[in-house]
């Protein structure tokens, strides 16, 4: 798993 994917996976907030 790349760091970008990990970062996206760590996003726990909902976009507007």
From Swiss-Prot:
Swiss-Prot/TrEMBL GO biological process terms: L-histidine biosynthetic process
Superkingdom of the organism of origin: Bacteria
Gene for this chain: hisL
Family, as annotated: Belongs to the HisL family.
Protein name, entry field: his operon leader peptide
InterPro entries: His_leader
Function description: This protein is involved in the attenuation mechanism for the control of the expression of the his operon structural genes.
Keywords of this entry: Amino-acid biosynthesis, Histidine biosynthesis, Leader peptide
């Amino acid at each position: 798993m790349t760091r970008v994917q990990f970062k996206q996976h760590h996003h726990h907030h909902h976009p507007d």
